[in-house]
Structures are given as structure tokens and as C-alpha cells.
């Protein structure tokens, strides 16, 4: 089976999960962002035992108005887009390629955070990504596009990039979700209260 066929099969599965939520798939987002036909996937066959058909991120290179860029698009349809050891390695590799080429790196964010099933390995992966963000600072443009939740450990990397674009009503940046807040503190909060907007700040402060 060709790489294109594998990507198509994976994308069809993702559509069944993403489209009912009003969200696009990882591949659809890349196709909209990049020049038509320019996307070349990196490490498509690098997967974990839990997800042999594809991990929770799609990485690669392409062009925007003819200019080369490197990209990674988190796939919420695979374990909530959570970051495990393999996902971290794929992101780090494409960031290294961007640094070597002196080209922008664009991260499309749609992740529930660390993959708790992998324990400390997922947290170490985040630490390595944050380190790479700092290493790349001032050397290449780093751009985050928040198109879904970017929760827990996933919230910090965008904060270290140069630009953050967030989809209204869908993109969410927060450290801890309402369920965890209620479990730990007993306080009930809405997602709106967790989002950093002036309207939410006024509403939640009373």
C-alpha cells in the first residue's frame, strides 16, 4: 500500500471523529495551509504499538506562497492528540529539520496534553520540546495555530513560540480542565472561565 493510500485511509477515519465536532482533520488542515500538492510527510511509518496505523501527529514539509516551511499537525482523533514518546520524537525531528534549513516551523495544535498511559516518558517529551523551542528562539520563526484544545503540557509550547493564532470558539489554551479543577478544589468552572479573554475575565470575576 502506498503512503498516499495510508494517509487517505487514516484521514477517512479521522473525519468520522472530527467532522461531527465541527473540526477538520490533521491532513485537511495541512492541505488548507500549504500550497497545493507541496506537502511531503516525514516519518509516516513511525508509530507506537498502541497506534500502528498512525500516531497522534502528522509531520512534514511544504511551501506557503513558494516559501519552504516545516509543519506538524496534531491529530485529536488518535488518543485525543495526546503526546507520548513517539509523538515527541516526531515533533522534535521536524523542528530539527526546520533549524537546519533556517525555515519557519508551524505547529497546528489540537491535543488533550500528556499521554498519561506513558507516565514520565510523555512529560520528558514535553521538556525536550520546550528546550527545542528555546533553542529555536531568535533563529527561525515559530508559529502556533490552536485549532482545538491545547491543554495541560500542550499549553506551554505555544507560549514559547513567536505567534499564536487561535480559532474562535474552538481553540482552547488552558493548563487544567473543569473536571480536574472540580476534583481537586471542589469548584465548578466553565471552559469560558479558563480561556484567556477579556470577556471571560469579566464574566468569571463577577
Regions found by a protein language model. Name each.
Residues 61-75, 90-116:
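A structural preference for short, pocket-lining loop segments at secondary-structure junctions
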Residues 22, 71, 110, 158, ...:
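Residue-level signature of catalytic and energy-coupling elements of molecular machines
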Residues 86-101, 118-146:
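An acidic, glycine-rich surface segment that forms the CoA-thioester-binding/catalytic face
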Residues 103, 109-117, 134-177:
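Glycine-rich beta-to-alpha active-site loop
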Residues 196-203:
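Conserved small/polar residues in nucleotide/adenosyl-binding loops
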Residues 74-80, 86, 108-128:
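Glycine- (often His-adjacent) and acidic-residue-rich active-site loop
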Residues 181:
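N-terminal cationic and glycine-rich segments that engage phosphates or anionic surfaces
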Residues 1-69, 73-80:
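Intrinsically disordered, low-complexity segments enriched in small/flexible residues
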Amino acid at each position: 500500500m502506498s503512503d498516499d493510500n495510508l494517509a487517505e485511509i487514516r484521514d477517512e477515519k479521522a473525519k468520522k471523529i472530527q467532522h461531527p465536532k465541527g473540526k477538520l482533520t490533521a491532513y485537511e488542515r495541512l492541505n488548507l495551509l500549504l500550497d497545493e500538492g507541496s506537502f511531503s510527510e516525514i516519518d509516516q511509518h513511525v508509530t507506537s504499538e498502541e497506534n500502528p496505523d498512525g500516531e497522534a501527529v502528522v509531520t512534514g514539509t511544504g511551501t506557503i506562497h513558494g516559501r519552504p516551511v516545516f509543519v506538524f499537525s496534531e491529530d485529536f482523533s488518535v488518543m485525543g492528540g495526546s503526546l507520548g514518546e513517539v509523538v515527541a520524537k516526531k515533533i522534535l525531528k521536524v523542528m530539527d529539520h526546520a533549524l537546519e534549513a533556517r525555515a519557519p516551523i508551524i505547529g497546528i495544535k489540537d491535543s488533550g496534553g500528556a499521554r498519561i498511559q506513558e507516565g514520565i516518558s510523555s512529560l520528558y517529551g514535553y521538556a525536550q520540546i520546550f528546550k527545542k523551542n528555546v533553542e529555536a528562539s531568535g533563529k527561525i520563526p515559530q508559529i502556533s495555530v490552536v485549532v482545538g484544545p491545547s491543554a495541560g503540557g500542550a499549553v506551554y509550547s505555544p507560549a514559547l513560540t513567536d505567534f499564536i493564532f487561535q480559532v474562535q470558539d474552538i481553540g482552547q489554551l488552558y493548563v487544567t480542565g473543569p473536571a480536574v479543577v472540580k476534583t481537586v478544589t471542589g469548584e465548578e468552572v466553565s471552559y469560558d472561565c479558563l480561556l484567556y479573554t477579556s470577556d471571560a475575565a469579566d464574566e468569571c470575576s463577577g
